[in-house]
Each structure stands twice: as C-alpha cells, then as structure tokens.
Amino acid sequence: MPQLNPAPWFMILSSTWLIYTIILQPKILSHLPTNNPTNKNNKINTNSWTWPWTQHSSTNS
C-alpha cells in the first residue's frame, strides 16, 4: 500500500502546494472588488440596548 510509505509525502505536498500557489496567486491578486465601500454620513444611533436579563431589579431579592 503506497500511502503507508511516508517518503514521497513531502515531495507530493510541496509540489502540489507550489502548483496551486502558482495557479491561484495571479487569480487572487487580479481580483477587484465589485462593490467598493462608500463613505456614508448616516446618523449613528448611540442608544444602548436594554436586555431583560441584565436589568437589576430589587424585587428579585
């Protein structure tokens, strides 16, 4: 069974990684985002949320 012989594993792993890097690197580097983020001046709501499990009430003593 050839998978039990670990001698060629490093060569197979490194050659596969090198091939994928050579093929995928130009594709990744040439990628341009389709939706560029825009600077929107929307009013930000600064009110905090009130969660029922974080409210401390004196009736639960």
UniProtKB/Swiss-Prot annotation:
GO terms for biological process: proton motive force-driven ATP synthesis. It is a single-pass membrane protein. One of its GO terms (cellular component) is mitochondrial membrane. One of its GO terms (molecular function) is proton transmembrane transporter activity. The keyword Transmembrane applies. The chain crosses the membrane at residues 10-32. Its main location: mitochondrion. Keywords: ATP synthesis, CF(0), Hydrogen ion transport, Ion transport, Membrane, Mitochondrion, Transmembrane, Transmembrane helix, Transport. PANTHER family: ATP SYNTHASE PROTEIN 8 (PTHR39937:SF1). Component of the ATP synthase complex composed at least of ATP5F1A/subunit alpha, ATP5F1B/subunit beta, ATP5MC1/subunit c (homooctomer), MT-ATP6/subunit a, MT-ATP8/subunit 8, ATP5ME/subunit e, ATP5MF/subunit f, ATP5MG/subunit g, ATP5MK/subunit k, ATP5MJ/subunit j, ATP5F1C/subunit gamma, ATP5F1D/subunit delta, ATP5F1E/subunit epsilon, ATP5PF/subunit F6, ATP5PB/subunit b, ATP5PD/subunit d, ATP5PO/subunit OSCP. Subunit 8, of the mitochondrial membrane ATP synthase complex (F(1)F(0) ATP synthase or Complex V) that produces ATP from ADP in the presence of a proton gradient across the membrane which is generated by electron transport complexes of the respiratory chain. ATP synthase complex consist of a soluble F(1) head domain - the catalytic core - and a membrane F(1) domain - the membrane proton channel. These two domains are linked by a central stalk rotating inside the F(1) region and a stationary peripheral stalk. Belongs to the ATPase protein 8 family. This is ATP synthase F(0) complex subunit 8. It comes from Chelonia mydas (Green sea-turtle).
